[in-house]
Amino acid sequence: MVVLSGAPRAAAADDRLQFTGTTLSGAPFNGATLQGKPAVLWFWAPFCPFCNAEAPGVSRVAAANPGVTFVGVAAHSDVGAMQNFVSKYGLNFTNLNDADGSIWARYNVPWQPAYVFYRADGSSTFVNNPTSAMSQQELSDRVSALRS
């Protein structure tokens, strides 16, 4: 598992949030809207077994934490497969089509699943474990820490 924490800094300091994308429904999305807010970026792919294992827990944790913005960043597949994944797991938060991998590259995501946890002060933690799915409890604990 790779865990990297960014040093606390002003919310406007993270240039990685200066991206634009397209939601799975075709609407524009601007990453800068996440500045200064607790947020979770979840990098996933529909064929990924760990992503499939995590998805129900991600859906529940997102629903239980309306004060934290969740954004899924899907890649390595076509939009139809991405939409089916979102529908299958009831992911009722914004999911982006990053088919070209540009947002993944911006965050140096080598493989899925991966997370970036943003605190309101702009500091962040990157978590990427290629050997197992994150448990719902670990995800819940990490999300709770964003508000403290």
Give the residues covered by each predicted segment.
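Thiol/disulfide oxidoreductase modules built on the thioredoxin-like
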Residues: 87-91, 99-147
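Structural microenvironment flanking redox-active thiols in thiol-disulfide oxidoreductases
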Residues: 52-89, 99-103
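Short loop/turn microsegments at loop-to-beta-strand junctions
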Residues: 17, 39, 112-113
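Hydrophobic beta-strand anchors of alpha/beta hydrolase catalytic cores
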Residues: 40-41, 70, 115
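Short active-site neighborhood of thiol/selenol oxidoreductases, capturing the structured segment around
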Residues: 30-52, 58
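N-terminal "domain-start" segment that seeds a small globular fold
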Residues: 3-31
